Amino acid sequence: MWNNLVAAPVARFARRDGDDFRLPLGSAHLATATPQGFRETMGATIATSLKMPPGEAAFFANRLLVFFSSCDARRFGQWEHMSWRDFVHGHKRSHEFRALLSRTLTSLLVAAKEDMASARTIGNMGEQFLGNPLEIGNDGDLDRVLNGPTNDVWIDPWVALLRGLGVRFEIGAEVRGLEVRDKRISGARIVDGAGTARTVEADHFVVALPAERARTLWSPAIREIRPELAAMDELYTDWMNGIQFYLRTSPDIVAGHAAFIDSPWALTSISQNQLWTRKLPEFGDGTVADCLSVDISNWNTPGILYGKPAKECTPDEIARESWAQITTHLNDRGEVLREADLHSWFLDPGISWQAEQRRNANADPLLINTAGSWDSRPRSHGALENLFLAGDYVRTNIDLATMEGASESARGAVNALLDVTGSGAPRCRTFTLYRSPELEPLRQMDADRYARGEPNLFDADI
């Protein structure tokens, strides 16, 4: 898969009835060795790139400095329990500040409202995103995507590799429960695709399920042995699903991701043909020239066509509403997307319209890192010796519902299993997130200040 990742070199931030701006995502060289240098350089970059008033840009840069210079104890003890909006004082700032630096950051990263998302999670990710273009703490470009259809260039080769290693997939089987005996999992109750129930016995069990599915398996017996798993009931999920628009032409939008800042549904997109090795006209009957793949991050806010949130729209209404919100951003300075160019669309099959309830159901919700949710997240391994957890809800350094977070949790589960069995096999390589060494003295100072109950050195309005 690694060789099938390609860089998306530019991001576009589109405004409705306003000037868009494009942000190159290549390497940069910013003089940030000192706190003052960081504030000035980052503030100027934000003011220039986002057309933000210099005073507000400087204020946001200072909030980043507060977080980056915070010790671990403060990050977990203070910022984890604060929303991103409160951390950046979004309720006190201008509309532009709230739209770009408070609301958009959280909706794009974690599909959450800025008054819900943990400041620690958003700050951690901001720390990585800013380090990447400086070519520190990263192993590639800031924004990378697959160079072809996900199944073709990732899932199918991965499945073939695993099968070659002896893995057997039981497609259509559902886990209904876990049996406990002598403080160990003795079996998993499953129902196969034919409706036949049976119990699978094994030496070890790895539960690699999303949080909302995994917690249904935690019986009273399991919760008695691992009481911390009961806290998973407090974990919050919301929706972040997509729709694909197949086009007869390849519109010139941007060579990477586009964010539609003023869209009620917090839409983002990417035009895939420009990044794929095998071009779209080579698929099907050749009439499709491009695919505009769109993420819908806000399913709770009414749209501009029907006055309904996406959760209450039929599939056809979702398509029309998403298209309308995108075109109002792209066509306000000239026609970029034309109705005549739309060949067809395809909605995420995880979204299903429930006619009687007049709303959608979602088979694939997204874990949201709400303020304080770290305390409700378990580790990969605990008191049940042969039970191991893998999923983006497990405590990880990445700390975000992403493939990278899930991968890190899986590495932790495998390493724990190898430790329990006393295996001499090599352990999975693990990683830590980047932190600027230049700010380490400030973080050590902050540890002393936090222990004394004092605020961060830079935690003041400017």
How should each PLM-predicted stretch be described?
Residues 1-63, 74:
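Dinucleotide-binding Rossmann-like beta1-alpha1 core, especially the glycine-rich loop
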Residues 14-16, 189-193:
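A generic structural motif
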Residues 48-69, 73-91, 95-108, 324-343, ...:
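Rossmann-like nucleotide/phosphate-binding core characteristic of flavoprotein oxidoreductases
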Residues 58-181:
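Active-site/ligand-binding neighborhood in enzyme catalytic cores
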Residues 82, 134-146, 189, 202-204, ...:
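C-terminal segments that line or cap access tunnels to active or ligand-binding sites in enzymes
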Residues 183-189:
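Short, hydrophobic/aromatic-rich segments at coil-to-beta transitions
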Residues 194-204:
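Core beta-strand elements of the Rossmann-like FAD/NAD(P) dinucleotide-binding domain
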Residues 416-462:
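Active-site-proximal substrate-binding core of FAD-dependent oxidoreductases
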